[in-house]
């Protein structure tokens, strides 16, 4: 489909524009389980702003089940440390709103309100493999079952 790696779209909106197909008509397979993503999963992939992966010049996304599973695997393998928001700002020399912080469970980028909630509730941000994570509002309410990082 896209032979030249330099010309490959990296985000779903770029792929949609390149193929001139709306999001809801895009058909992607999961890079892990090889199953076809549902329409909802394609839209979630776009909203999560993850990068498209190419296998044999074909674009792949990730289904919700595999995304949550491999997020947990990454947490177990690559967890480094946790810090409060004020400490994170001092470590990075950036404001909390200027940092890309993703949800530890669903990988959605946290909005400023979700980051502020961590500060208000005195919850920590986690460094997992050099990337900062927290919890989005949707995952905030779900109880953590295996680990309390």
From Swiss-Prot:
Q: Which Gene3D superfamilies match?
A: E6 early regulatory protein (3.30.240.40)
ZnF (unnamed) ranges: 30-66, 103-139
Q: GO terms for CC?
A: host cell cytoplasm; host cell nucleus
Where in or outside the cell?
A: Host cytoplasm; Host nucleus
* Quaternary structure annotation from Swiss-Prot or TrEMBL: Forms homodimers. Interacts with ubiquitin-protein ligase UBE3A/E6-AP and thus forms a complex with human TP53. Interacts with human NFX1 and MAGI3. Interacts with human IRF3; this interaction inhibits the establishment of antiviral state. Interacts with human TYK2; this interaction inhibits JAK-STAT activation by interferon alpha. Interacts with host DLG1; this interaction leads to the proteasomal degradation of DLG1.
Q: What else is known?
A: Belongs to the high risk human alphapapillomavirus family. The cancer-causing human papillomavirus E6 protein has a unique carboxy terminal PDZ domain containing substrate.
Source superkingdom = Viruses
Q: Which organism is it from?
A: Human papillomavirus 31
Which residue positions does the secretion signal occupy?
Answer: none
- What protein am I looking at? Protein E6
Q: State the similarity comment.
A: Belongs to the papillomaviridae E6 protein family.
Instruction: Kindly name one Pfam family recorded for this protein.
Output: E6
Q: Which GO terms describe its biological process?
A: DNA-templated transcription; regulation of DNA-templated transcription; symbiont-mediated perturbation of host apoptosis; symbiont-mediated perturbation of host ubiquitin-like protein modification; symbiont-mediated suppression of host cytoplasmic pattern recognition receptor signaling pathway via inhibition of IRF3 activity; symbiont-mediated suppression of host type I interferon-mediated signaling pathway
Per UniProt, the short sequence motif PDZ-binding domain occupies residue numbers 147-149
Q: What does this protein do?
A: Plays a major role in the induction and maintenance of cellular transformation. Acts mainly as an oncoprotein by stimulating the destruction of many host cell key regulatory proteins. E6 associates with host UBE3A/E6-AP ubiquitin-protein ligase, and inactivates tumor suppressors TP53 and TP73 by targeting them to the 26S proteasome for degradation. In turn, DNA damage and chromosomal instabilities increase and lead to cell proliferation and cancer development.
List UniProt keywords, sorted A-Z: Activator, DNA-binding, Early protein, Host cytoplasm, Host nucleus, Host-virus interaction, Inhibition of host innate immune response by virus, Inhibition of host IRF3 by virus, Inhibition of host RLR pathway by virus, Metal-binding, Modulation of host cell apoptosis by virus, Oncogene, Transcription, Transcription regulation, Viral immunoevasion, Zinc, Zinc-finger
An example molecular function term from Gene Ontology annotations? zinc ion binding
